[in-house]
Structures are given as C-alpha cells and as structure tokens.
Amino acid sequence: MRKIFLDRNENNYGPAPACYKVLENVDQNLFSNYTDAYKRGVKSALSERIAADFNLSEKRVILGYGAEDILKQLVQCYLNPGQKLMIPAFSWWYYKAIADEVGGINLEYPLIKGKDSFHYDIDSMLALAETEKPLLLFLSSPNNPTGNSISTTDLETVLTHMKDTIIALDEAYWYHSKDEHAKHLVNTYPNLVVIRTFSKYYALAGVRIAYALIGENLTRIANLANRYLGFNLIAEKIALAALDSPEYYEDIAKKMKSDKEIYYKELGRIPGFIVFKSDANFILVEIPREIKDSLKNFLTDRGLILKFMNEEFLNTHIRITLGTQEENHLVIETIKEFSSSNSDR
C-alpha cells in the first residue's frame, strides 16, 4: 500500500520541470569547481538575483541551507547564554531548541484562538517585550501550525516599539499568504530579518536552500553567513530555475487555495470538528478528544499520514498538509467515512 505523507508541509506536486532539466544538463564544472561569483563582487548568482528582485544591495542577502540554518546562524551570532529570545506560544518546536543550544532563555508570547482562526496578541507581545527586553524575537507568518499571518500594520507596530530587538520574520509559507512584507519593510527597519525558503512553495525541501533579507544594522550576521568558497552550485542553479517558473507554481497555489475551501466546507460540517482558516499550505483542524486515536489509526491503515498534534493546548488538533487534489479528496472522503461509521455506533 502506498503511503501518502501529509504531515510535513511538503509540496507533493514536486518542483517545476525546469528544475529537473538542471540535473539533466549538469556539466562537470558544477561538480568540480568552486564559485567564481566573487570576481563580480557578489557571493553567488542566486544572491545576486534575489538582490535584484528586491532592489537591495547584494550584501544584504544571505543564503543558508534551509530556513533552519539561517535561524540557527542568527541565534549563534547574536544570542549569548542567559540572553532572551521571544517565540510564539504555538509554533515550530525547533524555535525552542535553537535558544537552548546556546544557553539562551525562551520567552513565549501568546496567540489568541478565535472561532475559526488564530491571531497574534500584539498588546501582550509588546508588554512582555517591555518587561523582559529580549535580544531576539521570532515571528512566523504564516505561523506553523496555526496558519495565521501577521498584518503589515501589526508588524510595523512591533518593529516600531521593539527597535532594540532583532526581529526575525520567518516567512517559510509566505507565498500562500495575501500579505507581502519584505519589499517595503526591510529597507525601513534596520533591525528586521526576513527569512524565506525554497522548501515549501518551490518543492525543494531536499535541496536545502533558503535566503534572508537583512536590515542595515545587521552586518555581523552578513559576515558570519558569508562563504568565501561559495555555496552548493547545483542547488543554486535549481533554485534559479524555480524562480524562473512562476506560472507552474502559481497554478499549484490556485489548486491549493481551491482545495482549502473544500476542506473548510466538508470537514466543517462534521460534528465536533473546527477547521481554522489558514494562509499556508496546511490547515489545522480541532477534533473531539475521544476520537483522536481511532481516527489516526483509521487514516494510517489506509496509508494517510497526517500530523496529530501532541503539544500542550493543541493535543486535540490535526495539521493536514495540502497535497495534490487527488490526495486532498482522498483525505476528506476518508475522514467523512470514519465520521459516518463512528456516528452509526
């Protein structure tokens, strides 16, 4: 039986055809040679391209082996033992681990759970920052696993009130969100870092490549992230091919948006289910506690692997990655089948 993994927020459509062509046409130099981008006064062809797209100095674009790598570099660059990092209360578990690795202190700021969506509690966030004076703040937008984004207005409020804190905006899922922060904010706020990955939207998680746009005050991380001998040239070429394939990815985004609406409608009809609105490539669903184990087993027996949350306050929730349209239809119909058979007992 084929297993369908919808628990890791990957893009099951796969990368654009142009990405495969890079591998088909790769030549020896990409394997054997170091980069020569430094001859043009830049770090790489990819950082040069991204800088041009955002009208930034190439020195303010850094590359990393996934967003995880850039977040880790930020913490290791700036956070000393005993210093404080603010993170969302409900978010990626690795945020906590990064500070722990350097002896830092994690401070959790709250999210508010509404009827069918979550949102950041900006007032509580700022009050905590005023009291604790954190060195770093991680903001995830859209946030994993709750799917909510921070509005431009709220983000600017945070940036204005926390001028002495480095604000890392993790936009791993930004292509699926209606808000666009980077282009007009990173030039305005010198303490802002906007982090983006090729893993999610571009379906290149295995390639391990991401980038960040950094505010003008953050020269230390720019120096730390620099690699004199360059980055993975094949990965860079694949990433450039993805950037040159907007129509392919826009078509996938439209399919995912349509499927999200079907999830809201179909799962929202099931008694005891709450489907939360999401700006990302996944949705969060609250289910009755008493069916958690039996539903998980029912889905797993049919080859459907979803993320059943075990975190405090989210331990009756499922995070469902948006797969292909066929996969999404199968998940919905299987959950409806379980619900129907369960209600007949």
Set out the residue ranges of the language-model regions.
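PLP-dependent aminotransferase class I/II
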Residues: 14-16, 102, 191-269, 274-276
